Amino acid sequence: MQALIVIAHHDPDSLTHALAREVAAGLASAGHGSEIADLAHEGFDPRFTLADHAVHRGLAAPTADVLREQARIDRADALVLVYPIYWWSLPALLKGWVDRVFSNGWAFDYQDGVVTKKLRAMKVHLVGVAGADNGIFERHGYGAAMRVQIEHGIFDYCGAEVLSSNLLDDSEGPNAALHLRTARALGEQLFMPAHRQIA
């Protein structure tokens, strides 16, 4: 099995990148493959342009960079997003990737007021890296808001199934080693049947 691991962080020495490497290592140890899409290093342009708007309206085909990203996703058996949480949401680079890549005609069809979900086979795993602790997320409703926005608003809208959503909190505190172990375990268990996964 093959996973596409998408990273949206500008610093290759960040915890976010280290977590993505651990997910990949866990996958490899379980006999699976992975491809890492380092959006910052690859120079992906997250800006939604007039060309993207034309795609959304069904007036043009996606640009070459978007088609490449869609092909990467199509080749994968699972999609893993590893990202820092900025202002209680996805960073702009990753949000722009979603805006441009999950386009009308590929991720969904919208015609005459009817949405057809086209990514029903997609399995998604989310790894959000937060500086704040989980208590702040829950006390202010940020965790619930992110789940609605990302899991329901993006992936469910396209028919994709979010199999795991990990909030690795207090990332600037003493939990880095624990977070790395969590990421490794996620990779090891990514393609394991749910009833066999270790809690």
Predicted regions and their residues:
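N-terminal beta1-alpha1-beta2 submodule of the flavodoxin-like/Rossmannoid cofactor-binding fold
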Residues: 1-106, 170-199
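FMN-binding flavodoxin-like domain, especially the glycine-rich phosphate-binding loop
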Residues: 75, 92-96, 102-199
